[in-house]
């Protein structure tokens, strides 16, 4: 299920810079989720178009996904809708 893939938005200073300048959002996701699953979950939950997904495992043992949105979607607007700020 797509609602189980995304745990919560990852909010750091770097995440804010990515959002402002590169139209990217960062999320902590389920450890077993693949890039395609993350893209599908973001597209269905937030009604945006995803161009690319990069994932990495953090030092805390969590999986972080950096999601790049299409130029038609604004990462700041999506972040405000989901309550990042």
Feature map (PLM): residue ranges:
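Contiguous, often N-terminal, cationic amphipathic patches that form binding interfaces
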Residues: 1-85
């Amino acid at each position: 299920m797509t609602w189980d893939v995304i745990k919560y938005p990852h909010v750091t200073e770097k995440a804010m810079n990515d959002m402002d300048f590169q139209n990217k959002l960062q999320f902590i996701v389920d450890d077993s989720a693949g890039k395609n699953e993350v893209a599908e979950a973001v597209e269905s939950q937030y009604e945006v178009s995803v161009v690319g997904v990069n994932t990495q495992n953090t030092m805390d043992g969590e999986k972080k996904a950096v999601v790049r949105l299409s130029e038609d979607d604004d990462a700041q607007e999506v972040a405000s809708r989901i309550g990042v700020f």
